[in-house]
Amino acid sequence: MEQDDKFLFKEAVMAFDFKKEYKEFYMPKNTPAILTVPKANYIAVRGKGNPNEEGGAYQQAISVLYAVAYTLRMSYKTDHKIEGFFEYVVPPLEGFWWQENIHGVNYADKDSFNWISVIRLPDFVNQKDFEWAVETATKKEKVAPEKWKTVIRHPIKKL
């Protein structure tokens, strides 16, 4: 195999993309449907407050989620080797929003929003790998680890 062939072969190998492999969850049709979502790994951060607040809890939570997600995604370039690792595209951010004691939504009172924001992780990520990513991202990003929560192989509770 010549040098150019190796380059072409390497470029042809695509990273696993959750959006493409699980279209029913990430690219829904225009008609409502009830789906059964299988158990999966998620990084989750729970909070309360206005999502538009500059430097607020929500914006901090998003930076925490992405810091950990990308630390895990790029782990193959470090000394930390994750068993069963394969390259993947970090899935999109997902969010669950609600307001207590309000029927419907009161958009005028964004400070009363409760939220859980999550990013799905591949099944090969275990608790030890997650803890490594939290520690590594904390050193790198200087984000407060007390704001971090994980939901490993646990479905989000229906509210």
Where are these regions (language model features)?
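A solvent-exposed interaction/effector surface
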Residues: F7-L159
